[in-house]
C-alpha cells in the first residue's frame, strides 16, 4: 500500500467542513449553529463572490466535532441543506500531500475535469481552493497557458463542478482574477494526455473562444 491513507483528517484536531451555506452567511451565524456542541476555537469562512460559501469550524474537543457532524449534516438551514463532515487529509498530518516540495497533490482519480482561463499567477493551491467548493479534491495541477486539471474523489462532485463552477470568477493568491471554463477531460486536447489509455480527446470547444482576459491589481496585461 502506498503512503496515502484516506483518513477523516479533522477527526484528530476537532476540525469539520461545512458546505452548501447560504450566500449571506456570517461567522456569527456559524457560531450560532455549532456553539451548543462544544467550545469553538476557530471559524474560517470562505465566502467568494459568485460561489457557494463553505467554512471550517474547529472545536477544542475532537469529540464535539463528531457530535456536530451527527447533528448538523443534512440540516436544513434556510433554503440550504448543510453538508457537514470531517475534511479529508492524507498522510496522517493533515494538509495536502504533494508530488514534490512545491508540487501538487499526488493521489489520482478518474473523476477529472479540465479548467482553462486561469490567470498567470494562478497556482495549483489556488485552483484546489476554488474547485473544492464542489467536493473533495484529491489532485490539482496547473500547466502553462492558463490550463489546469482537477480530480475529485467522487463522481457526483465532478459532475457538480461541471454544472456550478463553469464560467465562475477565479482569484489567485496575488489577487488576479479571471472567469474560468470547466469541462470534461474528454472534450479537450490541451497539454494533458491520458497516460493510462494513451489517447486524447477531441479539441475543446473553448479553444475557439480566444484568449481570456485577466484583471490584475499589480500590473496591466
Curated annotation (Swiss-Prot):
UniProt organism field: Homo sapiens (Human)
One MF term in the entry's GO annotations: protein domain specific binding
GO biological process annotation, one example: alternative mRNA splicing, via spliceosome
Organ and tissue specificity: Expressed at high levels in the heart, kidney, pancreas and placenta, and at lower levels in the brain, liver, lung and skeletal muscle.
Cysteines joined through disulfide linkages: none
Recorded name of the encoding gene: SRSF9
Domain RRM: 14-89, 111-187
Keywords, sorted A to Z: Isopeptide bond, mRNA processing, mRNA splicing, Nucleus, Phosphoprotein, Repeat, Repressor, RNA-binding, Ubl conjugation
Protein location: Nucleus
Regions crossing the membrane: none
Reported function: Plays a role in constitutive splicing and can modulate the selection of alternative splice sites. Represses the splicing of MAPT/Tau exon 10.
Biased composition, class Low complexity, residue ranges: 189-198
Modification Phosphoserine occurs at: 189, 193, 195, 204, 208, 211, 216
GO cellular component terms, A-Z: nuclear speck; nucleolus; nucleoplasm
Source superkingdom: Eukaryota
SUPFAM superfamilies hit by this protein: RNA-binding domain, RBD
Region annotation Interaction with SAFB1: where it falls in the sequence: 188-200
Placement of covalent cross-link Glycyl lysine isopeptide (Lys-Gly) (interchain with G-Cter in SUMO2): 36
Sequence similarity: Belongs to the splicing factor SR family.
Principal location: nucleus
Protein name stated in the entry: Serine/arginine-rich splicing factor 9
